[in-house]
């Protein structure tokens, strides 16, 4: 009888026992997984924290706070384009310029003075800068220069003797500057360009070109000349004098009034347009030329 009662009680209670829902089973599994890896995850996090802390400490240790003196030094170095030119600097360094086998290129770098040049320099191109003055010291130790180009600067003063030691100089361009007068030119020039300046006739000495027996190309257009320069050498082939204030010429300007047989056969081009002169009023001034000047004849 007792056995039967126990069996009945068992049958009554079995339906009341239900398995845990799936979500609870999953949470138990996840919890078990987390428990199994808890120690490993804690170690990993602790290692990363120590690594980052160490890295931060290292970075903090290597930070150098500059003082006011060092900051000023850095500022001075940053704004100084060229070092001071030394008297005995035998091989100066081209800083803002490019130096290639005797040629120095300093174009559009905003320099306001001629930079130090290597002694072997033969060609200097310093166009479109802010140079205001040329001095004798600029080229005193550069005897092999053959070409100088200062087109497009602000040059208004050229010191006496600036080109006196440049016995090999063949081409000189001072175009597009602020010149009021011409300097003494070196004797071997073949090309001289001083167009687009403010040069008046009184700024050119009477014998400025007389001894330049190799001068072939002369460009003085777009200035303020009142007359054609005197004593132009026989070597000239091209003379540009257009857009000045030239109002008259004489029979001796290009020819020789006392020698009707004289022929100036080397001149190929004379430009006088843009001047107030009427060329047709001076027919004897061109009698020695093979080609008439370009300009107004009426």
From Swiss-Prot:
Transmembrane segments: none annotated. The keyword Disulfide bond applies. Keywords: Disulfide bond, Extracellular matrix, Glycoprotein, Growth factor, Leucine-rich repeat, Proteoglycan, Repeat, Secreted, Signal. InterPro entries: Leu-rich_rpt, Leu-rich_rpt_typical-subtyp, LRR_dom_sf, Mimecan/Epiphycan/Opticin. Disulfide bonds join 255-288. Glycans are attached at residues 88, 214, 258. It is found in: Secreted, Extracellular space, Extracellular matrix. Its main location: secreted. GO terms for biological process: articular cartilage development; bone development. PANTHER family: EPIPHYCAN-RELATED, MIMECAN. Belongs to the small leucine-rich proteoglycan (SLRP) family. SLRP class III subfamily. This is Mimecan. It comes from Pongo abelii (Sumatran orangutan). The lineage of its organism: Eukaryota, Metazoa, Chordata, Craniata, Vertebrata. The gene is OGN.
């Amino acid at each position: 009888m007792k056995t039967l009662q126990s069996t009945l009680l068992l049958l009554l209670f079995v339906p009341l026992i239900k398995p845990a829902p799936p979500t609870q089973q999953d949470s138990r599994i996840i919890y078990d997984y987390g428990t199994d890896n808890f120690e490993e995850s804690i170690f990993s996090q602790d290692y990363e924290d120590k690594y980052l802390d160490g890295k931060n400490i290292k970075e903090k240790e290597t930070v150098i706070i500059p003082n006011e003196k060092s900051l000023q030094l850095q500022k001075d170095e940053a704004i100084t384009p060229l070092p001071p030119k030394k008297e005995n600097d035998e091989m100066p360094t081209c800083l803002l310029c490019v130096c290639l086998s005797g040629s120095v290129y300093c174009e559009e770098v905003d320099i306001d003075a001629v930079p130090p040049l290597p002694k072997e320099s033969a060609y200097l191109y310093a166009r479109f800068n802010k140079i205001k003055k040329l001095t004798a010291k600029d080229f005193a130790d550069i005897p092999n220069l053959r070409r100088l180009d200062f087109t497009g600067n602000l040059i208004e003063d050229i010191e006496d003797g600036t080109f006196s030691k440049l016995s090999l100089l063949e081409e000189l361009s001072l175009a597009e500057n602020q010149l009021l007068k011409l300097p003494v030119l070196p004797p071997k020039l073949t090309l001289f360009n001083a167009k687009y300046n403010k040069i008046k006739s009184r700024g050119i000495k009477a014998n400025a070109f007389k001894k330049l027996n190799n001068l072939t190309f002369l460009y003085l257009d777009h200035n303020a000349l009142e007359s054609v320069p005197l004593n132009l050498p026989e070597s000239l082939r091209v003379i540009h004098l257009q857009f000045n204030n030239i109002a008259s010429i004489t029979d001796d300007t290009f020819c020789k009034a006392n020698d009707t047989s004289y022929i100036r056969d080397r001149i190929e081009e004379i430009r006088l347009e843009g001047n107030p002169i009427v060329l047709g009023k001076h027919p004897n001034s061109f009698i020695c030329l093979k080609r008439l000047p370009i300009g107004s004849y009426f």
